[in-house]
Amino acid sequence: MAENTMWHETLHDQFGQYFAVDNVLYHEKTDHQDLIIFENAAFGRVMALDGVVQTTERDEFIYHEMMTHVPLLAHGHAKHVLIIGGGDGAMLREVTRHKNVETITMVEIDAGVVSFCRQYLPNHNAGSYDDPRFTLVIDDGVNFVNQTHQTFDVIISDCTDPIGPGESLFTSAFYEGCKRCLNPGGIFVAQNGVCFLQQDEALDSHRKLSHYFSDVSFYQAAIPTYYGGIMTFAWATDNDAIRHLSSETIQARFHAAGLKCRYYNPAIHAAAFALPQYLHDALSAQ
């Protein structure tokens, strides 16, 4: 791809977004997918897989703070955390900020993503790959959760959209495996697309997760480069109470953790679980 051209995302057929490409840092097919990292004056370094934006330097903090701090602070005493995907290292970065976490296991199917992101997106991991609590496993996520002897308090599925390598992370086999290796009272969260445009994805996840967990819902965050509306995150647990913790409890845990965030705060935590009526209606209808 030539520099000073436009890169167009291919996620949707009828409309989309584009980025001006100031400088292509890397473009190659890995063992599993087409990966490009380029520079854009407005959003910094941008990574896309198979024609779909995965992360940008400018707005990644919103996604990663909400995927980590919501479940970890809701749980309150998570010691063992599993990240599925997350090869850019930013999810790991946010989990390492929780000093009570004792082990962090990250399962990434594509070793190339980890290698390239360490080189070209160093601010994403911010040195977290060197944290002594961290273990990297190169494996398929479905295989890992169904075979591991480890158990976890929080599982974060930082998956791509349900196409290509990410498709298996939206299956019943994956959700069943996550339930298998989740400790009692544990929490599973996963990115679930932009609900206004990808509502079927959310409904499918809700239907499948409900076979394994007693409390299944969603929470949301506005992330500019995941365009088309509010980003939806799946939430699943057997502890029905932790989705309804008091603001005082979340506030106390937030201060005790010593976190300083750019997007997440205790008020955002509570508000994120308020869902639009069209999603409530769709869930009720299925």
Swiss-Prot record:
Residue ranges of every copy of the PABS domain listed in the record: 5-238
Predominant location: cytoplasm
Superkingdom, natural source: Bacteria
Residues passing through the membrane, by range: none
Reaction catalyzed: S-adenosyl 3-(methylsulfanyl)propylamine + putrescine = S-methyl-5'-thioadenosine + spermidine + H(+)
GO MF, one example: spermidine synthase activity
Subcellular location: Cytoplasm
EC number: 2.5.1.16
GO biological process, one term: spermidine biosynthetic process
Pathway: Amine and polyamine biosynthesis; spermidine biosynthesis; spermidine from putrescine: step 1/1
Keywords: Cytoplasm, Polyamine biosynthesis, Spermidine biosynthesis, Transferase
UniProt xrefs under Gene3D superfamilies: Spermidine synthase, tetramerisation domain, Vaccinia Virus protein VP39
PROSITE patterns: PABS_1, PABS_2
Residues annotated to bind spermidine: H64, D88, D158, C159, T160, D161
Active site, per annotation: D158 (proton acceptor)
Residues that hold S-methyl-5'-thioadenosine according to the record: Q33, E108, D140, G141, P165
InterPro entries tied to this protein: PABS, PABS_CS, SAM-dependent_MTases_sf, Spermi_synthase, Spermidine_synt_N, Spermidine_synt_N_sf
Family per record: Belongs to the spermidine/spermine synthase family.
PANTHER family on file: SPERMIDINE SYNTHASE, SPERMIDINE/SPERMINE SYNTHASE
NCBIfam families, A to Z: MFS_SpdSyn, PRK00811.1, speE
Quaternary assembly: Homodimer or homotetramer.
Protein name: Polyamine aminopropyltransferase
Classification lineage: Bacteria, Pseudomonadati, Pseudomonadota, Gammaproteobacteria, Enterobacterales
